Curated annotation (Swiss-Prot):
InterPro entries: NGRN/Rrg9 (IPR010487). Residues 186-200 have a biased composition (Polar residues). It comes from Zygosaccharomyces rouxii (strain ATCC 2623 / CBS 732 / NBRC 1130 / NCYC 568 / NRRL Y-229). GO terms for cellular component: mitochondrion; nucleus. The keyword Mitochondrion applies. Keywords: Mitochondrion, Transit peptide. Belongs to the RRG9 family. The keyword Glycoprotein does not apply. Required for respiratory activity and maintenance and expression of the mitochondrial genome. It is found in: Mitochondrion. PANTHER family: NEUGRIN. This is Required for respiratory growth protein 9, mitochondrial. Residues 201-210 have a biased composition (Basic residues).
């Protein structure tokens, strides 16, 4: 305990006043000391929990944690997807069109012995998708079918206009001349000669054939 009085108090104050003062001082010091101890106790508990958490991580985990803080968000998402797929290739589920759904129902009605897995392999979807399509009772009305057909017709017209406006004109390919560099036996100088391409030979042959046909027809007319 901390002493609260000195020798001068015995000379100046009576004994009753002295005892009253000592009791008040002791109670005040005990209350102040208790609050300080409680505050220190709470801080010590927080520090202890922090130390336990830091000590529970190994050096490797701490390095990985620092790397995760530095890696960008897109890379973290890509790593999470690869971890979820377990190294397999990303293959999102395929959605069937209305025509394909109607075709699936028609095949099932004509061949009832086919199961969901076989139909799923045919349409490249999971058996659960096939079961949901076959169990659904929704059918489009005539108005909805008419709207769908009009929409597909407008889509085809837009695509046709787009191709007509951006039509690519095919240009003939220019075949470069083949240059052969060789040396003559008599002179040491280098000589560059051009070799005709295969297309040029084929063109000459076609021209010669046409010329022969025209000449034969001309001779036949004169002979008659």
């Amino acid at each position: 305990m901390i002493p609260f009085t000195s020798g001068k108090c015995y000379d100046r104050f009576p004994s009753m006043l002295f005892t009253y003062r000592v009791v008040i001082g002791r109670s005040f010091c005990q209350a102040h000391r208790g609050s300080l101890m409680a505050e220190n106790r709470s801080k010590g508990a927080k520090n202890a929990i922090k130390v336990v958490h830091e000590s529970s991580l190994t050096s490797k985990e701490q390095r990985e944690k620092s790397k995760d803080d530095e890696t960008p968000a897109w890379k973290i998402q890509k790593m999470a997807i690869s971890k979820k797929l377990k190294g397999q290739r990303w293959n999102p589920s395929k959605r069937l069109s209305r025509e394909e759904m109607e075709g699936l129902r028609l095949i099932k009605s004509q061949f009832p012995h086919l199961n969901a897995s076989e139909l799923g392999q045919q349409f490249k979807v999971s058996p659960e998708v096939v079961k949901r399509i076959l169990s659904s009772k929704w059918r489009p009305t005539e108005d909805e079918l008419g709207k769908l057909q009009d929409r597909w017709k407008q889509r085809g017209e837009r695509i046709k206009q787009m191709f007509d406006s951006h039509q690519i004109q095919e240009k003939p390919l220019v075949v470069p001349k083949r240059i052969v560099i060789n040396t003559l036996g008599s002179s040491p100088s280098v000589v560059a000669t051009t070799r005709p391409s295969k297309n040029a030979k084929s063109n000459k042959r076609t021209k010669n054939k046409l010329h022969l046909l025209q000449q034969r027809e001309h001779d036949h007319e004169h002979s008659e």
